[in-house]
Amino acid sequence: MFKFNEEKGQLKCSFCGKSQEQVRKLVAGPGVYICDECIDLCTEIVEEELGTEEDMEMNEIPKPKEICDILDDYVIGQDKAKKNLSVAVYNHYKRVNSGKGNDEVEIAKSNIAMIGPTGSGKTLLAQTLARIINVPFAMADATSLTEAGYVGEDVENILLKLIQAADYDVEKAEKGIIYIDEIDKVARKSENPSITRDVSGEGVQQALLKILEGTVASVPPQGGRKHPHQEFIQIDTTNILFIVGGAFDGIDQVIKRRLGKKVIGFGSHEKQEDLDTGQLLSKVLPEDLLRYGLIPEFIGRIPVIGSLTPLDEEALIEILTKPKNALVKQYQKLFEIDHVELEFEEEALQEIAKKAIERKTGARGLRSIIEGIIVDVMFDIPSREDVDRCIITKETVSDDDGSPKLVFRDGTVKLGNEKLPKESA
């Protein structure tokens, strides 16, 4: 009930009791009045509450061990890389949170480089990290980037992808993660600075420097090149975590040459010839990246280096079966929808892993191998209701004309490439 001063015939604020003469503005509502001073006070209270909630969200970032445990559910192996990434990501978002205070100590930004062969899990690790932290995530291919003014994508277009992933919420995008793949492809051709213009190599590294370090970038809302009189989205990259990744083919030889200089003599126990590719990659240093072709300024902006080892047969089999979204589980789900049980024999899984190693495709090649094996069966099964089980054997994978074994509901067993019996009415 609103307050009314009967003696003077004046309305009063329902919250503080001040009359309309004592305040600048009195806003009327259904049966109540509120003055401008109470409105300001309410606004401050709401802003403080929302600000506290945001800080709480930042404080609820999983601890490094918790991040690593979640990564274990989706990514097989690469324990050292997962540990390094978990610590780096946790520290990055601690830094973001600490920046809100007035502390004189400013924590430097720590972007991450991931070095490892194709199919070792670089992209999956970056995607999973973004899901764990629940921040916008964007992925870009360094090979499509060129220096500003040349044919190709400007580096600002990477930021546009992140803004789009955040539904154009710039404030949210400013705390996101960007993964730049194939960064090794923009390495310059030699250690020495290029005399000629290298617009897709060293030029791209130079163009990336500012956004890696932290700057307010102007991004064209529709992408493409910048034009005069165009509206831009302003985004601060200071708190965006950049993860760059690449196979860096041949860097193991660079590391081997560096180690070779240190093992000459009778006192050395571990010679570089005894180290495999994975062990060599684990010893990578910034100076190796410099020799490979990354410029010193670029290396200085990615202080955290994580190496991923090539996946062996055992790891590939685990990738097929262990993670929550394992490939075998995915295909079993697809067959289950058609009321058919899909079964992989242990020897079949071993053969699939061997094929992936032979093709040097790592985990990335597993899906195409399985798809090639069962595509004919997936074509026929949806049209039939008499198939009970589909079994993938060693011969199915190893033989050129291998085919899955089909078990029918009447007990009949046939190979998928045999002429199938007509379905009974």
Swiss-Prot record:
ATP binds at residues 117-124. Pfam families: AAA_2, ClpB_D2-small, zf-C4_ClpX. GO terms for biological process: cell division; proteolysis involved in protein catabolic process. Zn(2+) binds at residues 13, 16, 35, 38. SUPFAM superfamilies: Glucocorticoid receptor-like (DNA-binding domain), P-loop containing nucleoside triphosphate hydrolases. Coiled coil: none annotated. Residues 1-54 form the ClpX-type ZB domain. It comes from the Bacteria. GO terms for molecular function: ATP binding; ATP hydrolysis activity; ATP-dependent protein folding chaperone; protein dimerization activity; unfolded protein binding; zinc ion binding. Component of the ClpX-ClpP complex. Forms a hexameric ring that, in the presence of ATP, binds to fourteen ClpP subunits assembled into a disk-like structure with a central cavity, resembling the structure of eukaryotic proteasomes. NCBIfam families: clpX, PRK05342.1. Belongs to the ClpX chaperone family. ATP-dependent specificity component of the Clp protease. It directs the protease to specific substrates. Can perform chaperone functions in the absence of ClpP. This is ATP-dependent Clp protease ATP-binding subunit ClpX.
